Design a protein with these regions (language model features):
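A short, Lys/Arg-enriched amphipathic alpha-helix followed by its capping loop at the start of a domain
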Residues: 15-27, 204-207
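Dinucleotide-binding Rossmann-like beta1-alpha1 core, especially the glycine-rich loop
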Residues: 48-122
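Active-site/ligand-binding neighborhood in enzyme catalytic cores
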Residues: 92, 104, 108-225, 232-235
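Beta1/beta-strand and adjacent pyrophosphate-binding region of the FAD-binding site
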Residues: 1-12
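C-terminal catalytic lobe of FAD-dependent flavoproteins
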Residues: 321-370
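Conserved Rossmann-like nucleotide-cofactor binding loop
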Residues: 12, 37, 246
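Glycine-rich FAD pyrophosphate-binding loop
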Residues: 21-46
């Protein structure tokens, strides 16, 4: 009988378990989870009776097949929401990604348009700072990207950010004509269930053996064996990994860099905090926080009060992989050392800044290969 061991019970691990079980009814599938619950940051928590996830875990995708997969198991409610950033130097909120409609209202619009017209002498940008200076100019860079990315990634200079910056830093086009044109071709949704995604994790692992509080200490790729800190070990024919790959090799090549988040829940004595279709706000200046989220907008929780979550980048956890080429090279070095029959998926496993839909897509691809 083929033995499959899955490391990590977040979205990627649960999706892989569900899809592999559907395809192979008789395989022995074990999922090892570090904590005592499945779902990781997508699992519903409570503060003052208010349900919330760790950050705004809305389902956002350009792929209808990932939406249909999840919606069939866990009915989703489609969302229409606006994205805004507070720019302290202007004492104003603007849509993000940026728009010419907003630029026309800025006090320094003449300078901005002149910078956009002149461009820079940077021919081939090789990092986030140069990319923004070339595409948007100094003023817009400082308003929207300079300080936000320095605090988001905990770096002294955005020149350190030299991988994929033209994709993740702009969330689409750099500047749109009108406000709110971003994500017009994507599906945004959230579960109708009051417990959010929790039922999905139960459904996905219904026929899977789950072992909780299992801290992986290393993997012997030659013997195909996973060793845990409690001295237990599990042999495998196929290994699905969703945790940081440096852990599997005892960080023999060095530790991969991540950024974490300090999450601060705050209940306010009002029914609604943010207006209209605004679910969360970004803060792009020198303030320590990067985002606030109003969770009732997602959960539709009924209360005379409302819960917001304040997010401050920190070294607390491994929530964001680093968009730095040297870190990606280190990741690939670990992958090359793993041998056959190992599949790395999820944000930590693939060392990519990805979301729920990507995890589902990766799980689908793995299931199709084995």
């Amino acid at each position: 009988m083929t033995k499959v061991v899955i490391l990590g019970g977040g979205f990627a691990g649960c999706a892989a378990a569900h899809m592999i079980r559907k395809k192979h009814k008789d395989w022995d599938i074990i999922l090892l989870e570090l904590t005592d619950k499945l779902g990781a940051g997508n699992r519903t928590q409570f503060y003052g009776g208010h349900p919330h996830t760790f950050g705004p875990r809305h389902f956002l995708t350009p792929w209808n097949y990932t939406y249909e997969y999840l919606d069939e198991l866990l009915p989703l409610r489609k969302l229409d929401h606006s994205f805004y950033t507070y720019v302290e130097r202007d004492s104003n909120f603007y849509s993000f990604p940026m728009s010419y409609e907003d630029i026309d209202t800025m006090p320094d619009k003449d300078i901005i348009y002149e910078e956009l017209k002149q461009g820079t002498n940077i021919k081939d940008p090789s990092n986030l700072e140069d990319y923004w200076l070339k595409k948007a100019g100094k003023t817009l860079y400082e308003k929207f990207a300079k300080y936000y990315n320095q605090k988001m990634w905990l770096v002294d200079s955005n020149k350190e950010l030299d991988a994929g910056y033209d994709d993740w830093s702009t969330k689409g086009e750099l500047i749109y004509e009108k406000k709110g044109q971003n994500f017009h071709d994507m599906i945004s949704a959230y579960p109708k269930d009051p417990l959010g995604y929790d039922k999905y994790f139960d459904i996905a692992t219904r026929d899977i053996k789950i072992l909780y509080k299992k801290k992986v200490s290393r993997v012997d790729f030659e013997k195909k064996n996973v060793y845990c800190s409690d001295n237990s070990n599990y042999d495998y024919d196929v290994l699905i990994n969703t945790i940081s790959v440096d852990i599997l090799d005892q960080m023999c090549f060095g530790e991969l860099r991540y950024v974490g988040v300090d999450f601060i829940p705050i209940v306010l004595p009002i029914k609604q905090c943010l207006p209209g279709n605004t679910f969360f706000l970004y803060y792009s200046g020198k303030e320590v926080h990067k985002r606030i989220v109003e969770y009732k907008k997602f959960t539709l929780h009924e209360s005379e009060h409302t819960l917001i979550g304040l997010e401050i980048p920190s070294m607390n956890g491994k929530h964001y992989t680093m968009p730095i080429l040297s870190e990606i090279s280190l990741y690939k070095k670990y992958i090359d050392n793993q041998g056959d029959d190992v599949f790395n998926i999820g944000r930590a496993g693939s060392y990519e800044y990805i979301d729920i839909d990507d995890c589902i897509d990766q799980a689908m691809k793995v299931a199709s290969k084995i």
